[in-house]
Amino acid sequence: MLPSLQESLDGDEKELESSEEGGSAEERRLEPPPSSHYCLYSFRGSRLTQNRGDSDDGRSGGINAETPSGDDFSLSLVDTNLPSEVEPELRSFIAKRLSKGAVFEGLGNVASVELRIPGYRVGCYYCLFQQEKLLPEIAAMESEHNPSEYVVCFLGGSEKGLELFRLELDKYIQGLKNNMNCEERSLGNDVKSYLNSWYEDVVCPIQRVVLLFQEKLTFLLHAALSYTPVEFKESDEKTKRDINRFLSVASLQGLIHEGTMTSLCMAMTEEQHKSVIIDCSGPQPQFHNAGSNRFCEDWMQAFLHGAEAGNPFLFRQVLENFKLKAIQDTNNLKRFIRQAEMNHYALFKCYMFLKNCGSGDILLKIVKVEHEEMPEAKSVVAVLEEFMREALV
């Protein structure tokens, strides 16, 4: 296994468990059951005053969130699956956050909330959003001059765990807005089902993919790392959606130069095996044209180790560590290549690094694309390619 991989995994598992337990012995005694909840509130307040001038200290002004008070502020429950004795505590927590003016439309926040009954700390994602089309029961309460605003809260896991999914939850809110725009009468079953499914739709896909593929997960990791296109045969929509979500999170998109990513995708598509085929027609999915390497095999074992804990948030943390290690190895190889342009010993270090890192096949393709327009580095990459081919003979 790669150096420090097991230590990294164990550390993340303990940290996630510690954050969910709350840290102290008293908080660990009040550990939450494995459940998730939601709350949807309508919000009316004087917090959308635009200030486009400059502030006193010379900085450009943005949204000036005034502190709501009295008749200018209301937070009304629209729908929830929280126990009735707990919801007022959550509402009080959200009201305090709104009053501080640190909540911006469409950008979610994650915090840890301690609920007195049944008595545990839980991660809470909350997001303010505007709705173009009012639900009838809300429209009667709203002023003509005040746009309808809602606050949605998702509760589950820990603050650290939910933070890993904050961007996905922001996108999920956009889907909620679209569903609510389609409602003609009161809050319909589609919206309630959407709210109730947030945990399964956002948090659990990575876990489902790991449990589905087991040891074959190495092929999916390799495809994500190498930007190899993936096609499906006789797969249901939910499985396809889960796999695509996994590939999206596992790829290095956004972590390496966009031009490099585009060129690498084109290079991989032009190779003999254009796409990895996942055949779901049988009882177990089968891969065709799939590749693997020692790096992906080692990280596959890390995912299987995480499966024993049964914590869906842990899989996302392992996936983030997988990408971090890949980026670190890529940057190390680039540094060695720069040194090798003037130093033959550094060239040998490049070769030994590629041979031992476990993902030399992919790293070499990444740096080859990046150094295509740099003659000296390009010649170093060509020598390394020859060394690697000879090593395979």
Swiss-Prot record:
It comes from Mus musculus (Mouse). GO terms for biological process: intracellular protein transport; vesicle tethering to Golgi. InterPro entries: Njmu-R1. Residues 9-24 have a biased composition (Acidic residues). The modification Phosphoserine is found at residues 8, 18. It comes from the Eukaryota. Interacts with TBC1D23; this interaction may be indirect. May have a role in spermatogenesis. Signal peptide: none annotated. This is Protein Njmu-R1. Residues 1-74 are annotated as: Disordered. It holds the Pfam family Njmu-R1. Keywords: Phosphoprotein. GO terms for cellular component: cytoplasmic vesicle; cytosol; trans-Golgi network.
